Amino acid sequence: MSHWAEIDNNNKVIRVLVGDNNDPNGDEGYKWLIDNLGGTWIKTSYNGNIRYNFAGIGYTYDSVRDAFIAAEPDNAIGFDENTCRWIVPEIEL
């Protein structure tokens, strides 16, 4: 299956849709999205093999890194450029 994230003018993800599994390259799915829904769509991967992270509503698409990045959590202590994920302290139980 192909997964597509729609982003707004601020590169924020506003929705994520699933495409047909019979479209291996995603070209037909992308064309359908543009023709029927308009907007700006970026392909995302559920297993994170492209664009680092699976897009979620509220994530930001960073075109320089070509990555979907979650909103920074309040307890973030840094950002890992290798994974495009926020570093948060481990919670001890």
Enumerate the predicted regions with their spans.
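Interaction-interface detector
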Residues: 1-93
